[in-house]
Amino acid sequence: MGKPTGFMEYERQNKPAESPKERIKHFREFHTPLSKEEQERQGARCMACGVPFCQAGQMIMGMASGCPLHNLVPEWNDLIFHGNWEEAYYRLKKTNNFPEFTSRVCPALCEAACTCGLNGNAVSSKANEYSIIENAYEKGYAAARPVKVRTGKKVAVVGSGPSGLAVADMLNRRGHSVTVFEREDKVGGLLRYGIPNMKLEKQYIDRKVNIMEEEGITFVTNCNIGKDKKAASILKEFDRVVLCCGASHPRDIKAPGRDAKGIYFAVDFLKSTTKALWANDMKLVDGTYISAKGKHVIVIGGGDTGNDCIGTSMRHGAKSVLQVEMMPKAPDVRADNNPWPEWPKVCKTDYGQEEAAAVFGHDPRVYQTTVKEFIKDKEGNLCKVTLVKLEPKKDEKTGRMMMSEIPGTEYTVQADLVLIAAGFLGSEEYVTKAFGVEVNARTNVATPAGEYHTNVERVFTAGDMHRGQSLVVWAIREGREAAQEIDVSLMGYTNMNVQ
């Protein structure tokens, strides 16, 4: 702890954000990094706690508290305060393969568990992480380090999202020969097509993938395992196979009129925008994407993906945006039964919601509401949506609280475009069937508790395909742990340290 009184001397300083009305004019990241001197002062705010909850990564009441990767947050905060940015990078990389991703898209579980935030503002650890990794690229610390000795073992990774990339990176460093198969045209999975450009500019994915290629990893795109290439041939060619295909099967909304033209899954909407931008020099060309321009948009789902749909719709030039959320509004401050260091279950306004409020003059969200019916015109196009209010009721059989319709509360709103962001149900069935792996009741690939090997010999799994829809940081952790288990199965021992 370089400055014992740092948390008292310095206030938290956030990276300045471009104003909502200005940033919706482009698809670039919109936060301006602090200067190195300012960021060093932010590092001084870290209290170097005897028990640093920020790196605990524990589940409390079903929610994560602290970093699942067990990032050495107090260490690299102290190092940047002392100006030792290179060593800070090495301490960061010890636990996190991809800080260039997490420092942009992670909800900062570390900050929610920060002791400094118990009675004040948390240490800006996410921004510190961003500065460490970007400085490392600028100074050359993050350059490729090719492996010098190979084991002769070959591993296939199916899927190039964060878990697949983490598995590949760890096993390649160990000396195994790794090939990553991706069904899309570019590497990245969720990072590439599930997260909009203004949250994660795609050149940062390419920057890291290029380094991984220099280090010896082979990437094969436009190859859909289970369709374009048979599972049997993969198993014959490789010593081990890791399934990291994500939880890509979207949850649908079953309501009358669902077949109306103008209803899309959120991931298809976001993906079409990203592809159109990169095909046309970061400009949207009419007819090349699912457009919200001039339309009344309804987003179904109150999570991060729903917010991304709002932000993307605002950049398209939507006429109006309404976000429909089934659950009640969370409290503005922690409830007594939600104490620190639990994840704070409070109402938060994210960037897309902030942008819609700035343009339209009101919060786009409506709570305790769901779709009753999609209404079509004579041509089959969506023109309106009937919504209905909900209330929590206790199920007498299970004891669980369920959201039930309130009779007589139906109302109709205009809608030209509906985006379904209601989460994901699990992995793609054709992949699991191709390899013959068992799935659980949630259609996630089944493994013994705390392990990553499936019921099929030599086949492993990790990430959302294994644990269900989750955060990038959890996917990276699963990839690291799976790599360690795979290494043991190949070599009989491991020298990997994944925590």
Residue ranges, per PLM feature:
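Beta1-alpha1 glycine-rich phosphate/pyrophosphate-binding loop at the start
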Residues: 5-32, 41-44, 57, 68-82, ...
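FAD-site-proximal beta/loop scaffold in flavoenzymes
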Residues: 261-294, 393-469
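Ferredoxin-type iron-sulfur electron-transfer modules in oxidoreductases and energy-metabolism complexes
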Residues: 25-38, 64-65, 69-104, 108, ...
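Feature captures the FAD/FMN-dependent oxidoreductase FAD-binding
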Residues: 87, 149, 154-158, 206-256, ...
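Glycine-rich dinucleotide-binding loop and its adjacent helix/turn
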Residues: 131-149, 207-228, 250-316, 439-455
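C-terminal catalytic lobe of FAD-dependent flavoproteins
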Residues: 12-34, 42-45, 367-369, 375, ...
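A conserved FAD-binding loop/helix module that cradles the flavin
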Residues: 306-309, 316, 462-493
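Short cysteine clusters
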Residues: 46-49, 54-58, 63, 67, ...
